[in-house]
Amino acid sequence: HLHACAGTSYIWTVTERVNFHSSPAIHLIGKKAFAMANMDVGDVSLIDLYSCFPSAVELGCQELGIAEDDPRGLTITGGLPYFGGPGNNYVMHSIVTMAEKLRANPGKFGLCTGNGWYVTKHSAGIYSTKPVESDWQREDPKKYQVEIDSMPHPTVTQKPSGPAKVETYSVITDRKGKRFGLIVGRTANNSRFLANTSDDDVTLDRMMREEMLGREGQVSQEGPINLFRFA
């Protein structure tokens, strides 16, 4: 029996999101699903968090209030990277596995979540062999999607210039070992921008070795790209 469900989409354009270390959309589907089922996360016995990448699992734990070392475990299939996602259909398999495990544990409750795109589309369902005791009706997601859509979006500048700091970053390597650095940063007026770093080994090695979040520097346009130089 499906006791609760919820679905939302986060801000579609990644550069317009509030930050890169939280997911208000996951938090909202958890809030809605647990309210619909009249329970909280401590009442479920089985959990399967969508597990395309470690960061998706970490965000799920953070937003749903589940410890990363929760003794209940975070997957019932072994996780998407190991179980697989045949036909781009992993969540159907996690729901079927959940049904099998709940039939073996009558009366227990289980939570399955899913996400798609760049941790953009989110869903949650709470299941049990126990029948729903009251009238049940799915809430139209449009009624609460507005909570996400109305969140403040950072201003994104295409031509940043001047003092800036790192909001998040990555060093990307191709199959031949060629590397380049990518910065998402904030200018002095808090506008967000995208920029490359210089491609010298000293800079890229430093980015791989040290924590660069919050580091300051200068950003400017150089030809067709924005370039960020660490102070």
Each language-model region and where it sits:
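Short nucleic-acid-contacting surface segments enriched for D/E, G, S/T with interspersed K/R
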Residues: 202-220
